[in-house]
Amino acid sequence: MELIEQVSVAKKANIYFEGKVASRSVFFSDGSKQTLGVVLPGEYEFSTSQGEIMQVTSGSFEVLLPDSTTWQTFSEGSQFELVANVSFKIRNSAIAEYCCSYL
């Protein structure tokens, strides 16, 4: 199991899509932040307010990136990058997890 050490974690979860997506914010001493999330099976659309790197930490997602018409599969250990102010879709058929780093 990979650990994130010496951080502060928000007690309250970020809940989206009627509880089907949940994440926790993790704050580092240098002021940076990540979110660790769990996604139940479904299809969801998200928007970014800043650049992000999404790393799949368990399971897999199909992702429809901005300006794309083709779904791409990202499995555990893979990642994709998003710029600020775009929308993208993810779908999954089993529970999956992610770590989002903000740029």
Curated annotation (Swiss-Prot):
GO cellular component: cytosol
Keyword flag Transferase: yes
Record-linked SUPFAM superfamilies: RmlC-like cupins (SSF51182)
GO molecular function ontology, one term from the record: thymidine phosphorylase activity
Highest taxon of the lineage: Bacteria
A matching Pfam family: Ppnp
Enzyme nomenclature, EC number: 2.4.2.1, 2.4.2.2
Stored InterPro entries: Ppnp, RmlC-like_jellyroll, RmlC_Cupin_sf
Keyword Transferase on entry: yes
Coiled coil location: none
Enzyme class per UniProt: transferase
Function statement: Catalyzes the phosphorolysis of diverse nucleosides, yielding D-ribose 1-phosphate and the respective free bases. Can use uridine, adenosine, guanosine, cytidine, thymidine, inosine and xanthosine as substrates. Also catalyzes the reverse reactions.
Family the UniProt entry places it in: Belongs to the nucleoside phosphorylase PpnP family.
Protein name (database record): Pyrimidine/purine nucleoside phosphorylase
